[in-house]
């Protein structure tokens, strides 16, 4: 049966003819040697070119990464070997290696050795630690040596392919070949070793259009692969998958099964002739080089064939065709297991599998394990790996009952088995693209998903969703349908379905309508998943472990690479995962936490109260966050052990007592500020004052003191502002307290002398001379003329009209400021804009000083145009003067004689002469 290999193109790069490709072991890079003399490094993850080396102006026929040195080695038609640092683009070294075109470079996997082959029919060994000295020359070929490759199982031997129609096997310690393999009728272009330990095989491709598989121990040809229409230019045994890749000048890459040698697939991307193929252990990526560019394909799936039994003690996996077992119970007691770290487990070989495993799955009770691959399945006992059943199938799934399973065949027929015997079979109405196990038997059709009852095959429900996977919880009450970009969590009414199946009531063409109800939809791609109670644990496309419970998603951890869920072990409170390198890691996930969250979502608070004491203290804050999201903030406050979280919760529910206690414990200014805001909304002004003082919120204290009329607090704010350099607050505090002297001193201290001068002119004219002198002294240091231009009011009184009155007003207001009025009288006092100090001074001099304060009423409104200085006070005028002015104005009026006055009636009395 076929391997069913998924093949996806990861990178397509158009370029000049590509003669050689190589993959970097650590970075997502492909190295391309071009016929035009350039070398490219392509990043196949972001599809970008990383580097472009212009090596020479002749073809570069070979290039290799040396990752441990950050090097690229190139061999070209100018007979030169060049060494570049691929990070700095610096040419480290270059030398002439051969007397003809260089064909191939092979780098020793561990030692500082490099092999080169050439059209001069020689193979040479170089040592870069000895100044690139040539340590050995291998002679024996009688034509161009096209390719050389190290034996991955014995790095001291290598093979070479030559146009003399032979393949030779060499040893590093000898100048002559160990033996020669003959069988091709034309020149041999390429050669490669089989990487597995079970077969001593070589593969070669030649101009006779044939690919030959050789047993290099028996020195015989064991298989010949035919099918290409032109010369074979590249061959490759994949280091992990059971496949052989061959490339030809006919433009195709053929993939063959390395066990049966049947053709699996043929790829033709239209890039003309194939020149090179490269693969690497640890990845399913394969690089292809063509006339018109390069391509990277991903062959097969990277998810490892691994499975954990239901108890969680044993893991079975496949390493190539070898089955191995890991027993987690063998981890020594007392071993500290850290989240995300590789577990120190010992593997036990269980023997070879008869098929190449692509998936492995335990049955629900863990007694049996099924291995699927090559279109076949084999059921083994999980302990001894004894064969219990086998057959042909495209898919295999277990039911929740441990002895039931189903298979899907090529023709779309589905067969159900119980105790390894076929029980029923049917062909779904809309075909069967995929099948799913679990509480109900799922079949994905062309139109959606259909669930059937395992016992009767009665249709339970059709759902218009085409999932990639279906995950059931143990009780069958919940199911997750995972699609390409989202997943749906459905509740299942199993009792109603059972009743409908038994009584045939409520059954429709699409099944039982109320069998499923949607509980949630999440736009997230599920890679692997499993249920623990009512919690769905899964890994997503961005390498996170999350779990879904009652509509809430909780992140357990972020992964640094792709991992696959194996299972959850309740007694360990840990989830186990594996990666493609067959490493096992684990993360702590408390079962009691999951049970508590499940109980809360079911609103079973009695059960939640029982479970809560079993939750370790270090996990209670996570539970509190969950309760908060569910709206149970008071309960979250009681459960949480994190002081910051408790403080936030106390603020949210308005519990000022707990919040105050926590704030006093932490002495965090931000918390005091937050508490002040909440206390303000609760009208607890004494607490607001304490919080603002603890938070050193001078602006807030300024507002509070002015709003409450607290002069003492206002003075404290001013002093603190001065001490801490907040001069604006200090100034405002003094100004609000009518301490204009302090305001002036603050302006002087802060070197704001121009402002101080204007302030003194307005409020303290007696200080003007002192300020002007300070200002003149400072300004003179910058511009002496400008300093001298400042006028001192004491010397130039003529330039300051009304200064005398201003000094008298200052004295008067100073006495008034000494009599502090209570804040409660503010509503009865005039605003500053309504007051006229000079008139108040005149009134005071006439014996009515302070009348507006004692009577607690506002004075009569005085217009703003009222006189404010002695120079502006008008002398009293007589009635005779007024008459003279009026006569002058009348004499200046010119009357129009043309005005019709017939309609004007004047009073005779008005016209009569006195």
Curated annotation (Swiss-Prot):
InterPro entries for this protein: Beta-prop_COPA/B_2nd (IPR006692), Coatomer_complex_subunit (IPR050844), COPB2 (IPR016453), G-protein_beta_WD-40_rep (IPR020472), TPR_COPA_B (IPR056176), WD40/YVTN_repeat-like_dom_sf (IPR015943), WD40_repeat_dom_sf (IPR036322), WD40_rpt (IPR001680)
Ranges for the WD repeats: 13-54, 55-94, 97-136, 140-180, 183-224, 227-266, 352-390
A GO cellular-component term linked to this record: Golgi membrane
Keywords of the record: Cytoplasm, Cytoplasmic vesicle, ER-Golgi transport, Golgi apparatus, Membrane, Protein transport, Repeat, Transport, WD repeat
One Gene Ontology biological process: intracellular protein transport
Family membership: Belongs to the WD repeat COPB2 family.
Name of this chain's protein: Coatomer subunit beta'
Protein species of origin: Drosophila melanogaster
């Amino acid at each position: 049966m076929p391997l069913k290999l998924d093949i996806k193109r990861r990178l397509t790069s158009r370029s000049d003819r590509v003669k050689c490709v190589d993959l970097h072991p650590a970075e997502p890079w492909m190295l391309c040697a071009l016929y035009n003399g350039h070398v490219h490094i392509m990043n196949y993850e972001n599809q970008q070119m990383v580097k472009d080396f212009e090596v020479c102006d002749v073809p570069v026929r070979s290039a290799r990464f040396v990752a441990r040195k950050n090097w690229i080695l190139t061999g070209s038609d100018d007979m030169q070997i060049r060494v570049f640092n691929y990070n700095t683009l610096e040419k480290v070294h270059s030398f002439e290696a051969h007397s003809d075109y260089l064909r191939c470079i092979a780098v020793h996997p561990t030692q500082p050795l490099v092999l080169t082959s050439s059209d001069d029919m020689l193979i040479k060994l170089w040592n870069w630690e000895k100044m690139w000295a040539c340590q050995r020359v291998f002679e024996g070929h009688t034509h161009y040596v096209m390719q050389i490759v190290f034996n991955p199982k014995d790095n001291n031997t290598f093979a070479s392919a030559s146009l003399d129609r032979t393949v030779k096997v060499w040893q590093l310690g000898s100048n002559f070949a160990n033996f020669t393999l003959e069988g091709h009728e034309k020149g041999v272009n390429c050669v490669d070793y089989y990487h597995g330990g079970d077969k001593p095989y070589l593969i070669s491709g030649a101009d006779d259009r044939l690919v030959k598989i050789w047993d290099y121990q028996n020195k015989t040809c064991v298989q010949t692969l035919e099918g290409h229409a032109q010369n074979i230019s590249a061959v490759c045994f994949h280091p992990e998958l059971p496949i052989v890749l061959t490339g030809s000048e006919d433009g195709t890459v053929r993939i063959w099964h390395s066990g049966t040698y049947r053709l699996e697939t043929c790829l033709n991307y239209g890039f003309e002739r194939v020149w090179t193929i490269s693969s690497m252990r640890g990845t399913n990526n394969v690089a292809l080089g063509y006339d018109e560019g390069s391509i990277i394909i991903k062959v097969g799936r990277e998810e490892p064939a691994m499975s954990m039994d239901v108890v969680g003690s044993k893991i079975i996996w496949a390493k190539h065709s070898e089955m191995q077992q890991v027993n987690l119970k063998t981890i020594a007691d007392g071993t500290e297991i850290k989240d995300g770290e590789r577990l120190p487990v010992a593997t036990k070989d269980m023997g070879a599998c008869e098929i190449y495993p692509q998936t492995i799955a335990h049955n629900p009770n863990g007694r049996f394990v099924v291995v699927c691959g090559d279109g076949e399945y084999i059921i083994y006992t999980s302990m001894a790996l004894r064969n219990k059943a086998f057959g042909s199938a495209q898919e295999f799934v277990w039911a929740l009952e441990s002895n039931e399973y189903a298979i899907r065949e090529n023709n779309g027929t589905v067969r159900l088995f119980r105790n390894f015997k076929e029980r029923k079979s049917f062909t779904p109405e809309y075909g069967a693209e995929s099948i799913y196990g679990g509480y109900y038997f799922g079949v994905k059709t062309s139109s959606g998903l259909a669930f059937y009852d395992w016992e009767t095959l009665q249709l339970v429900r059709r759902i218009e969703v085409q999932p990639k996977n279906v995950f059931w919880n143990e009780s069958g009450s919940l199911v997750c349908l995972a699609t390409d970009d989202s997943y749906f969590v459905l509740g299942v009414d199993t009792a109603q379905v059972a009743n409908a199946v038994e009584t045939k009531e409520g059954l429709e063409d699409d099944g039982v309508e109320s069998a499923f109800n949607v509980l949630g939809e999440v736009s997230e791609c599920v890679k692997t998943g499993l249920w623990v109670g009512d919690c769905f644990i899964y890994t997503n496309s961005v390498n996170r472990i999350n779990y879904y419970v009652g509509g809430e998603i909780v992140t357990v951890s972020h992964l640094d690479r792709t991992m696959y869920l194996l299972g959850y072990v309740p007694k360990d409170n840990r989830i186990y995962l594996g990666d493609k390198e067959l490493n096992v890691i684990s993360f702590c996930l408390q079962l009691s936490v999951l049970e508590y969250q499940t109980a809360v979502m079911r609103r079973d608070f009695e059960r939640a109260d029982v479970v809560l004491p079993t939750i370790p203290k270090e996990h209670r804050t996570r539970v509190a966050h969950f309760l908060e999201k569910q709206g149970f903030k008071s309960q979250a406050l009681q459960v949480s052990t994190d002081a910051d979280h408790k403080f936030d919760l106390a603020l949210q529910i308005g519990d000022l007592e707990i919040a105050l206690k926590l704030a006093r414990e932490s002495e965090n200014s931000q918390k005091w500020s937050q508490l002040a805001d909440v206390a303000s909304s609760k009208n607890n002004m004494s607490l607001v004052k304490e919080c603002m003082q603890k938070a050193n919120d001078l602006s807030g204290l300024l507002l509070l003191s002015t709003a409450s009329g607290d002069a003492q607090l206002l003075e404290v704010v001013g002093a603190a502002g001065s001490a801490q350099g907040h001069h604006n607050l200090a100034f405002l505090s003094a100004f609000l307290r009518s301490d204009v002297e302090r305001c002036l001193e603050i302006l002087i201290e802060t070197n704001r002398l121009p402002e101080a001068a204007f302030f003194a002119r307005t409020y303290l004219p007696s200080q003007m001379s002192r300020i002007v002198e300070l200002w003149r002294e400072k300004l003179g240091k910058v511009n002496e003329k400008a300093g001298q231009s400042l006028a001192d009011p004491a010397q130039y009184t003529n330039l300051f009209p009304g200064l005398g009155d201003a000094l008298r007003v200052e004295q008067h207001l100073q006495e008034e400021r000494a009599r502090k009025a209570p804040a409660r009288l503010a509503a009865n006092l005039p605003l500053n804009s309504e007051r006229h100090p000079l008139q108040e001074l005149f009134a005071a001099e006439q014996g009515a000083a302070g009348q507006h304060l004692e009577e607690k009423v506002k004075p009569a409104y005085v217009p703003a145009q009222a006189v404010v200085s002695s120079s502006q006070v008008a002398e009293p005028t007589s009635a005779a003067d007024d008459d003279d002015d009026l006569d002058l104005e009348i004499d200046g009026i010119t009357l129009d004689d043309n005005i019709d006055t017939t309609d004007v009636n004047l009073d005779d009395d008005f016209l009569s002469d006195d």
